Amino acid sequence: AEKIKICLQKQVNSSFSLHNVFGGNLYATEEKRMFELVKPKAGASVLNQSTWICFGDSRTDQSNSAFPRSADVSAKTAEKFRSLSGGSLMLSMFGPPGKVDYLYQGCGKHKVFYEGVNWSPHAAIDCYRKNWTDIKLNFQKSIYELASQSHCMSLVNALDKTIPLQATKGVAKNCNNSFLKNPALYTQEVKPLEQICGEENLAFFTLPTQFGTYECKLHLVASCYFIYDSKEVYNKRGCGNYFQVIYDSSGKVVGGLDNRVSPYTGNSGDTPTMQCDMLQLKPGRYSVRSSPRFLLMPERSYCFDMKEKGLVTAVQSIWGKGRKSDYAVDQACLSTPGCMLIQKQKPYIGEADDHHGDQEMRELLSGLDYEARCISQSGWVNETSPFTEEYLLPPKFGRCPLAAKEESIPKIPDGLLIPTSGTDTTVTKPKSRIFGIDDLIIGLFFVAIVEAGIGGYLLGSRKESGGGVTKESAEKGFEKIGNDIQILRSSTNIAIEKLNDRISHDEQAIRDLTLEIENARSEALLGELGIIRALLVGNISIGLQESLWELASEITNRAGDLAVEVSPGCWIIDNNICDQSCQNFIFKFNETAPVPTIPPLDTKIDLQSDPFYWGSSLGLAITTPISLAALVISGIAICRTK
């Protein structure tokens, strides 16, 4: 009889790298970073496709005769817009003669504004004011501010009002022989006698608590009045000083101008200029008092429900060549906390005409077709990696990656994986031992693995008191790290909110502080990943060793009396009794099926956090898929000895 010894033998050479961790070690043919750095895509996107709304004009209007060539967005995104060609929120607020008057209204947690160009210097709107840019800036800023605190908003295009009997609607030559719809101009006929100057105007208007289906907790109202350079300009007929003042129901002044107590400009000019201040007023009844001759009456508002904080994105709205634009939208967004601004880098060049269908703008707005994990002033990200090469500029919302250097991201073994025989001798009760951040806090420790030669693996029975990290303890370690990170981030967020309150007057200080905190969090997260990497390697090592034990047990069971296990992973077999086909059945499973191995280990960790700063939030989806199927047998050779 000829007896031979068949053993499982390691296949490790110089191409393998050794990964030492507490609890178990691995040889691997490759390694990869736990995460790759992501690069934000320029432009706008949204966190949730079901909770956003847009306000636009002809560049987003599906009813435009040149659509889709006239559009800067896809047909899918255009469905989200409340748009009408020629319209803008400010045009609907003031209603200058001959301009589009569209009822803007809608609801959404995230509001995108791509409008404003239709009221610009090219529109040449006069009505007692040659340049409306500063009023437009304040109007857009107020819209963005209130929209960020509301779920729904709507134009209220008809306020209830009471007008004095002696006043009648007036017109102006410099307003196309008409006047604005808001404010409306009312005049009194005054005889050219000093003693007959007319009566003081007393009017009333009511801001509703609801407009249609839209709840109104706060209204944006334009308080407009004339500015005279001198008393003589207004007082040509000897009728005193000019005043136009708005009072609330308690008699408190909330807006307007009173030249009875305030000085005139002192400039030289014969024509007054109209000024409009943006007031945020609660629903209720208000009174307007004005000097004889003229009354400017608020007749419209924008109403906001103020129900929840939300996100606001403003898109630069400018003309193509040959038309003069302003940059009020840009300036308004940049001066509104939390507003994200989308800006072009090149002149507007349209496809349908010079002013509609710009390719760069289409690219910047293409992200509105998708859901992003993070949106920021630097762009949007939909990858799951928690790291980016450059710091993302605020404002930012969602699960935003932190800035990190590529070389600082831990690497994990990949490719062909083979466990070693090394164990962490400092761990005596693996089933009750939990690895976590406390291991680093209590004190640093270093585990030296001393092996003969290049190393390998050990097959055999595992004792309860043996070293190594069990799958159960690794999973508990993951859970503990997750909880530690949650506590750390929650405390950090609370601290940030308090600091924001204390230094809210210094926006740059907030930005600097936030950057420092983000850098610290990035370093902390990289440290956490180092721990997670160690747990992963230990978990995989134990899993592979379990697979080898299962393989050895399966071989012993298949052999029955034909082979005798003389040591872990080695069997003696009688070559005359068990021929090649018999051996193939036992050791190669008839060469018809792969060697049974454990399924891929679940190494997915999902760490969530509370909102970050300025409404933002940070989260991680740490996913390290490691496929172990068929890897164990590919790293093992059948060694025969006689």
From Swiss-Prot:
GO molecular function: host cell surface receptor binding; sialate 4-O-acetylesterase activity; sialate 9-O-acetylesterase activity
Its EC number(s): 3.1.1.53
Topological relation to the membrane, as annotated: Single-pass type I membrane protein
Any Gene Ontology CC annotation: membrane
Enzyme class name: hydrolase
Region: Fusion domain-2, residue numbers: 352-637
Glycosylation sites: N13, N48, N131, N176, N382, N539, N590
InterPro entries for the chain: Capsid_hemagglutn (IPR008980), Hemagglutn-estrase_core (IPR007142), Hemagglutn-estrase_hemagglutn (IPR003860), Hemagglutn_influenz_A/B (IPR001364), Hemagglutn_stalk_influenz-C (IPR014831)
Reaction(s) this enzyme catalyzes, per UniProt: N-acetyl-9-O-acetylneuraminate + H2O = N-acetylneuraminate + acetate + H(+); N-acetyl-4-O-acetylneuraminate + H2O = N-acetylneuraminate + acetate + H(+)
Region (Fusion domain-1): 1
Alphabetically ordered keywords of this record: Disulfide bond, Fusion of virus membrane with host endosomal membrane, Fusion of virus membrane with host membrane, Glycoprotein, Hemagglutinin, Host cell membrane, Host membrane, Host-virus interaction, Hydrolase, Membrane, Transmembrane, Transmembrane helix, Viral attachment to host cell, Viral envelope protein, Viral penetration into host cytoplasm, Virion, Virus endocytosis by host, Virus entry into host cell
Compartments reported by the entry: Virion membrane; Host cell membrane
Residue intervals on the Cytoplasmic side: 639-642
Region annotation (Esterase domain-1) ranges: 1-83
Function, in words: Binds to the N-acetyl-9-O-acetylneuraminic acid residues on the cell surface, bringing about the attachment of the virus particle to the cell. Plays a major role in the determination of host range restriction and virulence. Class I viral fusion protein. Responsible for penetration of the virus into the cell cytoplasm by mediating the fusion of the membrane of the endocytosed virus particle with the endosomal membrane. Low pH in endosomes induce an irreversible conformational change in HEF2, releasing the fusion hydrophobic peptide. Several trimers are required to form a competent fusion pore.
Name under which the protein is recorded: Hemagglutinin-esterase-fusion glycoprotein
